[in-house]
């Protein structure tokens, strides 16, 4: 096994070495580069396909490989790299080459003239093939960009050490891949040539041959298309726009490119001569001011490789204008060696003269100062020119990391230059090198880390041992002390062990003026010091005296802002004349293509259009000589040239795709799937299936989406159609004018005449006047092509060519009748009222549209009101008809019943008469048999009655044929069966005791055959027979008749009161249940149908009705019988509650005594048994308690809701959640308030008082129920909290109530709103989604109005101002707290003394507590803060609230202050409450308020308060006064500066200066209103009578009158009042505490169940349950924290150390390369278990120590990603926001408990 593992380990290590080797990586990259097939492969494939010979194939392949090899060599050979990497070099080479290439393909005979085949390599065509492949391989990376794979070589260059080996291996890999690719191409071509099917088919053979012949032309076309495709997006660099440079000052620091020749653009030759190479201090502090042009960091001149830093230094020689020079002799003092510096300057000057001819040639080909990236000009208002970017993207240098030297690509350039300068000085001074080349650097680094780790871990173990000894040792900041015993430490400003805010801020000790001042300067005095020690190290020159003499010229090092050379202007700025400098010949920046449309031209001279009245207007129309007013119109075509700098180099966009032949916009491939495209072309299978099978399903979408895109697309299509048609605008213009004339003067008057004629024919009054009056309001305004309104009569300029629109104002719609204002039923509801259509545009078809070229809209229909009216009348007639039919049916049924009753009576009469009046046949009776009927027939036939007149008829019937007899027998059988069925039904109905009137019980009832035969007899015979039968059976008939009357009438009369009483009681019970427990009925979840019928509830209901009627006068706390019954009934139905005994309840003699009926019922239900009093119920656990609480929706929260709520907040705010208002309960009142709030105000106040009184009764009743439930549930507990109050005396009961007020009196502490206005729990969460709108109801706001006090709205007329007189409606809502703060103690003085913490009366009894429910009209997020302040006002400890000051404002003072107040509230006592200005109020406040604290305050704090009271008050008074004085001194200063400012304006300026941010709100709404005003003003200038349209525009809200007041010198106050200027305070960021951060860390793994049940007061008992870790469940809760805040940090062991030591210990424990990254200290369980005695002792932290150790091990993970974020920032220098994305991933494991 050991051998196998050894071999396996070696194999893996070998594989890892092979995989990470440079050769393998190079081969891999080179092989992949083969697949980046670019345009250079065109020539290579051309030689293969065209079969031009083996020589050309070999030359093409050779040139291709040589080109790739040259590209690899150029990486190490700098001149070749510069030659191939310069854009102007490529420009010079490519354009002639392309010209030569196309000339070569078209004129081959010129080059192949006199060519022989003797030596084929001398043939010019073969050499050209070689050059084609060679040159295009070089061009591939620059002109024709290839894919990213080709550039992977350069990326990996900075990662490997052996770069030459990597380049060689990558070239070999590329060569292998290329050979394989060419072999594959050859095999494919060979297969095509040898394929029999291709050769046998003459068509394919012909196509192949033609393809081979035209291959050269096809490849040339492809090459040309490719070149145009890539070059088309880049302007030609030869003809560029040369921009004019601006005049530069000494403050501007120029940035030029790295080439020496470019310095000729700088200004001033003296500054080029002067300067310093190494003494430039700006190099030490300035960052690399990189330009985007500086992408290639390695440059070279004369074949020598130089780093970028050398060129940066040379830039300073020419460009730096802040060098230190002597202004008198113009000599530099750089090194002190002045002659060497002059020689260098002369050499550079000669070099510059040598290259004079290069400057115009190079700038002609390629402008180095081109605006290429960014190519859009972002103007900066603070500076004249744009600011350059000051940090280059990449700078490469080596730096030590993890014991190795690694290349860093974001190394600070200034640090690199500084390091080189230090290195040179150290080598000159003979010192050691700064970076020693030690081979054991890595080992040294590892050993140093191990020592640090051991040191820190040893310190950590010592601290744990100190904790074990009993001391709480938490590391604090170390101070530098002189004497440890006396603790004499250095001050924090000078302590080197402290950092951050402890050290204070560094102040500037001197300025330039102080240094340069010869009197105050300290350089010439005896104290001569160096500003910087590094400065002395760098400038260690022998001749340092000269430097000291010139040190007065040293200025403060400061950073100059680099600016570009140009100050650019746009086309629009030049047209508008906004540019203040000299007008240039052409603007440099292209603006959007615009057209200026003149909307007003002043043809008359000195015409004063505007009339100005009022003293405040400063506008002078004489100075404003405005000839024309024009509006800029932008073209709707896409303009890619906007905001581009002319001559700028466009960036080649590599991340754009084109998928259409003609594409309008550029798109990124990231959003390709979101763009509408052809699904058949892109193989979008799902969309194709939807298109095919969409009509089959015939399913409409669930939500109808707006077709906004389709509508805009249709509008554009219509507009494009008119523009593409020849003379389209002319035709459209004439059509619009024709439609306008037809509509206005022909169509609409004709319709009006026709309508009124029809009304006259229908005998109705005509409406000539109303119709023609509305018709005259319709106006047709001529507009421009884009909708700018001009005039009603004047056409726009060139409207036939440019186009025209006609806008209709107040369009006329024909109506069948006019609604009368007196008819109230026609008035629409304000919510249902549609927005009136006031304007539209006319189309060429005479239709109306909202927008030009938009879809036609439907106007109000003429026949729709008629149709609706007819429908109403038809419905009314239909109702009347159905009512008539129903009444007719009822009458018909009544008549039928009466007829049947009479027939029954007649039957009975005939049955009772035995004598036959006439000689007729006896009627067949179903009860007799067949023989009886035959014998009867015989007797009848033999009787002497045959002599009667019907004798022949009877003789014919007896002598009938055989068929008639058979038919008679069949009918007899059917009647017999029917009679039997009817008899069975009668007997069955008799058994069920159901009696009906229509049913005949007698057995001698006439059968079906009797009825049939009777219909054939005369009436007199029937009546005779029935009368005889009735006389015969009269006794039986009377008997049955009396029985029917008894059963149907008397029994119903007896049972009717009982049934009605029962129904009445049940309905009354439902109403009372709903009244008493409206919330419980919706929450209990118990079906009303399955409730037990408790009979004594019905009996007690009647008694309760009398108590409810007297509810206002009854103030007693005695329970009614229904309340007890209801409580016990609820207790009996709870499934989690066992029916235990309540013996002590029945023995209690006070208000909780129980009726005898309830006792009996409880004994029947086995809730109470007297013989089992000694048994105690079991203790109820949390699960039973949770099941008990599920019945109420307030308690039925999800785990997420439980995790968000604290138990105490939950108990104090069970019903103060942000719940939805039940709209039905207050709908009518809220609507009446919307109509007239002032009229209904008094009615609402009265209703609110009743609601408050009812609400208090509900609270007291609910409290009694809950108290009884508490005692019942917790009867078996031994704790004093649940002790039964029935077994103690009165004193003990009061003691228990006072000690546990949070349990018993919890509902008295609540201010609960009415529950009848709320819905169930499922609507609580998504409150804003469910409601349609927020209702505003004044009932919600309860003021501090007592029983005999109401608060009215103050309606005062302010007559103090002379000019403006108006009525001010002051709302009580905004100042609702002010009412109580000032008038409370006057109206309701308190007899008892105030507590110290009774701020603003917060701890008052519930009787005087107001009920606020602001969640329904205010923002619900702010209501939580308001409620928190009401429940715990000490969370905002304002010093003013500490003292119960009492106002002493008299009536006369109030009346005098009325002149300067804006608020007024009139109570019933006619007391005004006003606020004055700040200075007067503060003065009165200090003078008139009693600031002495209460006696409770002194008793609470003892004697210390008496001693410190005066001191604290004095300090507080003096602080307030000093602050006020400072504020007023600032105000006085501002008054001296601006005498015109008032007191309020000065205060506003002071407020803005200190505390507020302000901005000018130029939002979309303001912009839109300004544009609407411009349109309206342009329209008004051309109207003949603009008065009507002005009034209508103001009424419609189109004209914003506030903007008309804005002119040039508008003061700040007017802007603020108009809403243009807004003030917002600074927002404070939230500071999280340690507990919250710990909860955020652990909440992903743990949550404690105790958080769902326990109260915060119980957590402070410093006790934890034994089953602590069994209660952990995943997520949805906060972490359990012990109540002792002092030892809270001991849960996390790393909190023992300081923050810096923690991070250091964690990182060093991970950076342990020699031992497999194992943290021995913290992974060893035995060492941690040594802390067991410490964990067991004191504080009752845990009982199970092993579980606690597991918990602490969990809090100490081996790998913390938060540390990786810090390491990522400082080690890898990724200074962006992505480093914190790793810290969002929590990799803490789930805490498993064994």
Curated annotation (Swiss-Prot):
GO terms for cellular component: chloroplast inner membrane. Residues 244-307 are annotated as: Disordered. InterPro entries: TIC214. Part of the Tic complex. Residues 259-276, 286-307 have a biased composition (Basic and acidic residues). This is Protein TIC 214. Keywords: Chloroplast, Membrane, Plastid, Plastid inner membrane, Protein transport, Transmembrane, Transmembrane helix, Transport. Belongs to the TIC214 family. The lineage of its organism: Eukaryota, Viridiplantae, Streptophyta, Embryophyta, Tracheophyta. It comes from Amborella trichopoda. It is a multi-pass membrane protein. Involved in protein precursor import into chloroplasts. May be part of an intermediate translocation complex acting as a protein-conducting channel at the inner envelope. The chain crosses the membrane at residues 23-43, 64-84, 87-107, 124-144, 172-192, 218-238. PANTHER family: PROTEIN TIC 214, PROTEIN TIC 214-RELATED. Residues 248-258 have a biased composition (Acidic residues). GO terms for biological process: protein transport. Coiled coil: none annotated. It is found in: Plastid, Chloroplast inner membrane.
């Amino acid at each position: 096994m050991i051998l196998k593992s050894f071999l396996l380990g070696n194999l893996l290590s070998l594989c890892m070495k092979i995989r990470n080797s440079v050769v393998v990586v190079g081969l891999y990259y080179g092989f992949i580069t083969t697949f980046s097939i670019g345009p250079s492969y065109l020539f290579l494939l051309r030689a293969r396909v065209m079969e031009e010979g083996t020589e050309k194939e070999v030359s093409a392949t050779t040139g291709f490989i040589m080109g790739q090899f040259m590209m690899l060599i150029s990486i190490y050979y700098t001149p070749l790299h510069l030659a191939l990497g310069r854009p102007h070099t490529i420009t010079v080479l490519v354009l002639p080459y392309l010209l030569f290439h196309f000339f070569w393909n078209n004129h081959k005979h010129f080059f192949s003239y006199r060519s022989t085949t003797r030596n084929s390599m001398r043939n010019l065509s073969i050499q050209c093939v070689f050059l084609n492949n060679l040159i295009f391989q070089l061009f591939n990376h620059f002109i024709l960009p290839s894919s990213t794979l080709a550039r992977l070589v350069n990326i990996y260059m900075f990662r490997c050490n052996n770069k030459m080996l990597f380049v060689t291996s990558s070239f070999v890999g590329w060569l292998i891949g290329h050979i394989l690719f060419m072999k594959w191409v050859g095999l494919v071509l060979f297969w095509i040539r040898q394929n029999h099917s291709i050769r046998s088919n003459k068509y394919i053979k012909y196509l192949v041959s033609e393809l081979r012949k035209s291959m050269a032309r096809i490849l040339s076309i492809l090459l040309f298309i490719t070149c145009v495709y890539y070059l088309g997006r880049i302007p030609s660099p030869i003809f560029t726009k040369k921009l004019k440079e601006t005049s530069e000052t000494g403050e501007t620091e120029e940035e030029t490119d790295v080439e020496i020749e470019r310095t000729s653009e700088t200004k001033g030759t003296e500054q080029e001569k002067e300067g310093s190479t190494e003494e430039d201090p700006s190099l030490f502090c300035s960052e690399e001011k990189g330009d985007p042009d500086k992408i290639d960091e390695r440059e070279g001149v004369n074949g020598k490789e130089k780093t970028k830093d050398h060129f940066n230094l040379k830039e300073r020689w020419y460009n730096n204008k802040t060098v230190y020079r002597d202004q008198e002799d113009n000599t530099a003092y750089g090194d002190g060696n002045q002659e060497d510096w002059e020689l260098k300057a002369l050499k550079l000057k000669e070099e510059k003269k040598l290259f004079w001819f290069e400057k115009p040639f190079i700038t002609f080909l390629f402008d180095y100062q081109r605006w290429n990236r960014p190519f859009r000009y972002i103007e900066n208002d603070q500076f004249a020119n744009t600011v350059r970017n000051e940090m280059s993207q990449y700078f490469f240098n080596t730096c030590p990391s993890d014991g190795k030297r690694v290349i860093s690509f974001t190394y600070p350039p200034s640090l690199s230059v500084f390091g080189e300068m230090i290195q040179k000085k150290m080598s000159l001074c003979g010192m050691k090198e700064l970076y020693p080349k030690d081979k054991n650097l890595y080992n040294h680094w590892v050993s140093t880390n191990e020592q640090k780790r051991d040191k820190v871990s040893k310190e950590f173990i010592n601290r744990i041992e100190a904790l074990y000894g009993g001391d709480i040792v938490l590391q604090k900041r170390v101070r530098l002390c002189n004497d440890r015993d006396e603790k004499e430490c250095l001050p924090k400003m000078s302590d080197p062990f402290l950092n951050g805010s402890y050290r204070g801020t560094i102040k500037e000790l001197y300025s330039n003026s102080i240094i340069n001042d010869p009197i105050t300067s300290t350089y010439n005095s005896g104290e001569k010091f160096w500003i910087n020690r590094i400065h002395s190290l760098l400038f260690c020159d022998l001749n340092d005296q000269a430097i000291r003499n010139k040190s007065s010229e040293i200025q403060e090092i400061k950073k100059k802002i680099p600016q570009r050379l140009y100050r650019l202007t746009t086309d629009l700025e030049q047209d508008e004349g906004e540019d203040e400098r000299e007008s240039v010949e052409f603007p440099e920046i292209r603006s959007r293509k615009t057209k200026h449309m003149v909307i007003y031209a002043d043809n008359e001279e000195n015409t004063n259009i505007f009339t100005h009245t009022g003293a405040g207007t400063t506008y002078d129309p004489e100075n404003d000589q405005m000839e024309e007013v024009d509006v800029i119109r932008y073209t709707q075509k896409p303009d890619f040239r906007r905001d581009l700098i002319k001559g700028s180099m466009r960036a080649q966009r590599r991340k754009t795709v084109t998928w259409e032949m003609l594409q309008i916009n550029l798109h990124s491939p990231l959003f390709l799937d979101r763009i509408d495209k052809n699904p058949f072309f892109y193989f979008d299978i799902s969309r194709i299936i939807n298109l095919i099978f969409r009509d089959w399903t015939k399913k409409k979408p669930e939500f109808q989406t707006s077709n906004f895109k389709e509508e805009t697309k249709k509008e554009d299509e219509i507009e494009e159609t008119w523009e593409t048609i020849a003379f389209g605008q002319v035709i459209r213009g004439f059509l619009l004018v024709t439609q306008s004339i037809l509509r206005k003067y022909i169509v609409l008057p004709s319709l009006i005449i026709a309508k009124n004629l029809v009304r006259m024919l229908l005998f109705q009054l005509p409406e000539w006047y109303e119709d023609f009056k509305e018709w005259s309001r319709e106006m047709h305004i001529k507009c421009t092509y884009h909708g700018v309104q001009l005039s009603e009569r004047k056409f726009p300029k060139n409207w036939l060519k440019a186009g025209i629109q006609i806008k209709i104002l107040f369009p006329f719609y024909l109506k069948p009748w006019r609604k009368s204002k007196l008819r109230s039923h026609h008035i629409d509801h304000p919510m249902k009222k549609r927005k009136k259509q006031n304007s539209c545009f006319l189309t060429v078809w005479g239709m109306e549209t909202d927008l030009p070229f938009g879809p036609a809209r439907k106007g109000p229909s003429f026949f729709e009101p008629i149709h609706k009216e007819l429908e109403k009348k038809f419905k009314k007639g239909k109702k009347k008809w159905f009512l008539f039919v129903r009444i007719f049916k009822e009458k018909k049924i009544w008549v039928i019943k009466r007829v049947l009753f009479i027939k029954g009576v007649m039957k009975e009469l005939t049955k009772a008469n035995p004598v036959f009046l006439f000689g007729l046949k006896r009627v067949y009776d179903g009860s007799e048999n067949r023989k009886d009927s035959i014998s009867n027939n015989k007797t009848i036939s033999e009787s002497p009655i045959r002599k009667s007149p019907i004798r022949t008829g009877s003789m014919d019937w007896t002598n009938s044929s055989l068929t008639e007899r058979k038919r008679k027998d069949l009918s007899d059988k059917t009647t017999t069966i029917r009679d039997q069925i009817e008899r069975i039904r009668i007997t069955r109905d008799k058994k069920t005791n159901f009696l009906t009137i229509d049913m005949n019980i007698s057995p001698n009832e006439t059968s079906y055959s009797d009825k049939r035969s009777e219909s054939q007899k005369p009436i007199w015979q029937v009546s005779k027979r029935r009368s005889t039968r009735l006389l015969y059976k009269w006794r039986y008939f009377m008997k049955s008749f009396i029985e029917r009357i008894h059963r149907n009438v008397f029994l119903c009369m007896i049972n009717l009161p009982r049934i009605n009483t029962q129904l009445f009681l049940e309905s009354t019970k439902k109403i009372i249940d709903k009244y008493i427990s409206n919330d419980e009925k919706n929450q209990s979840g118990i079906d009303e149908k399955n409730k037990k019928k408790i009979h004594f509830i019905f009996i007690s209901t009647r008694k309760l009705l009398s108590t409810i009627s007297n509810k206002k006068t009854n103030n007693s706390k005695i329970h009614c019988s229904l309340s007890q019954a209801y409580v016990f009934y609820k207790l009996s139905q709870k499934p989690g509650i066992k029916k235990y005994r309540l013996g002590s309840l029945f023995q209690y003699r006070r208000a909780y005594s129980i009726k005898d009926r309830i006792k009996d019922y409880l004994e029947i239900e086995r809730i109470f048994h007297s013989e089992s009093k000694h048994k105690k119920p079991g203790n109820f656990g949390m699960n039973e308690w949770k099941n008990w609480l599920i019945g109420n929706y307030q308690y039925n929260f999800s785990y997420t809701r439980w995790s968000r709520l604290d138990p105490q907040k939950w108990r104090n705010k069970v019903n103060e959640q942000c719940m939805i208002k039940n709209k039905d309960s207050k709908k009518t009142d809220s609507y009446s308030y919307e109509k007239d709030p002032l009229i209904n105000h008094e009615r609402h106040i009265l209703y609110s008082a009743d609601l408050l009184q009812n609400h208090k009764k509900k609270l007291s009743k609910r409290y009694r129920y809950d108290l009884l439930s508490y005692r019942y549930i917790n009867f078996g507990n031994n704790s004093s909290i649940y002790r039964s109050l029935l077994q103690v005396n009165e004193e003990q009961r009061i003691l228990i109530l006072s000690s546990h007020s949070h349990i018993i009196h919890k509902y008295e502490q609540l201010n609960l709103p009415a529950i009848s206005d709320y819905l169930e729990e499922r609507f609580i969460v998504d409150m804003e989604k469910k409601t349609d709108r927020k209702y505003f109801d004044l009932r919600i706001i309860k003021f501090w109005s007592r029983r005999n006090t109401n608060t009215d709205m103050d309606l005062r007329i302010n007559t103090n101002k002379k000019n403006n007189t108006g009525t001010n409606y002051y709302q009580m809502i905004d100042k609702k707290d002010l009412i109580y703060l000032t008038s409370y103690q006057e109206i309701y003085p308190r007899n008892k003394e105030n507590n110290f913490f009774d701020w603003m009366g917060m701890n008052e009894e519930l009787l005087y507590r107001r009920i606020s429910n602001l969640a329904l009209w205010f923002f619900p997020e702010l209501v939580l803060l308001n409620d928190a302040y009401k429940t715990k006002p000490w969370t905002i400890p304002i010093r003013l609230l500490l003292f119960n000051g009492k106002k002493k404002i008299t009536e006369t003072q109030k009346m005098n202050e009325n002149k300067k107040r804006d608020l007024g509230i009139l109570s019933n006592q006619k007391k005004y409450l006003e606020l004055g200005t700040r200075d007067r109020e503060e003065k009165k406040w200090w003078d008139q308020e009693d600031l002495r604290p209460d006696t409770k305050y002194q008793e609470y704090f003892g004697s210390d308060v008496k001693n410190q009271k005066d001191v604290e008050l004095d300090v507080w008074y003096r602080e307030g006064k000093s602050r006020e004085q400072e504020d007023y001194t600032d105000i006085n200063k501002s008054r001296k500066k601006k005498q015109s400012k008032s007191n309020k304006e000065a205060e506003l300026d002071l407020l803005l200066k200190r505390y507020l941010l302000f901005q000018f709100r130029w939002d979309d709404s303001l912009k839109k209103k300004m544009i609407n005003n411009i349109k309206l003003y342009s329209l008004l200038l051309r109207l003949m009578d603009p008065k009507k349209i002005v009034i209508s525009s103001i009424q419609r809200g189109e004209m914003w009158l506030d903007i008309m007041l804005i002119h040039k010198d508008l003061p700040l106050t007017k802007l603020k009042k108009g809403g243009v200027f807004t003030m917002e305070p600074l927002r404070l960021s939230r500071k999280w505490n340690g507990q919250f951060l710990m909860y955020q860390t652990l909440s992903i793994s743990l949550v404690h169940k105790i958080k769902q049940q326990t109260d915060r007061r119980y957590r402070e008992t410093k006790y934890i349950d034994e089953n602590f870790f069994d209660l952990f469940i995943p997520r949805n809760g906060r972490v359990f924290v012990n109540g002792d805040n002092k030892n809270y940090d001991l849960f996390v062991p790393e909190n023992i150390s300081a923050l810096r030591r923690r991070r250091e210990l964690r990182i060093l424990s991970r950076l342990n390369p020699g031992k497999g990254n194992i943290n021995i200290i913290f992974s060893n369980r035995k060492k941690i278990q040594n802390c067991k005695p410490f964990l067991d002792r004191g504080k009752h932290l845990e009982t199970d120590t092993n579980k606690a150790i597991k918990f602490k091990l969990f809090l100490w993970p081996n790998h913390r990603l938060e540390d990786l974020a810090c390491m990522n920032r400082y080690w890898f220098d990724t200074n962006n926001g992505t480093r914190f994305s790793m810290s969002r991933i929590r990799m803490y494991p789930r805490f498993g408990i064994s």
